[in-house]
Amino acid sequence: MIEFKNVDKVYPGGFKALKDINLTIKDGEFVAIIGRSGAGKSTLIRTINKMHDINAGTLTVDGVDVKSLKGKELRKFRRNIGMIFQSFNLVERISVIKNVMSSFVPDLNPIQSLLGIYPKECKLKALEALEQVDILDKAFERADNLSGGQQHR
């Protein structure tokens, strides 16, 4: 469950993107957030995984106080949240599987990260993810070979 209680988000300079937001999204519920450009839709979504901090109120995800998360706890929390952005940032010249595995970089030690050495479990999870979105057959192709719809997946 995701729960916003009296949430405010004010950007530097004083722009208030969110004001007194109260919203509960229960497990299994599908929700559409619609509104005009600049209404705060993206800001609201980005507070869920703490890409943006809230300034007031409380935000909990499955009982976890998002505002209090830091460091390793925040990284562990984010592993369970998937976000699809309006514009995707694939590295076109590398393989599809390497693009997927790049999501594991925060969990690697500095040497693994620098050299791009991924543990077997990361490779298996990446392959599973590609299978789930029906592009496993594209795993070792360059990302720029994917159609727009495949890139979104």
Pin down the residues of each PLM region:
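Helix-to-loop junction immediately C-terminal to a conserved catalytic motif
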Residues: 49
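Conserved ABC ATPase signature
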Residues: 141-150
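The feature captures the beta-strand-to-loop junction immediately N-terminal to the Walker
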Residues: 34-36
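Short coil-to-helix segment of the ABC ATPase nucleotide-binding domain corresponding to the Q-loop/switch region
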Residues: 93-108
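Conserved ABC ATPase "signature" region
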Residues: 64-65, 108-138
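Conserved ABC transporter NBD signature motif
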Residues: 56-65, 77
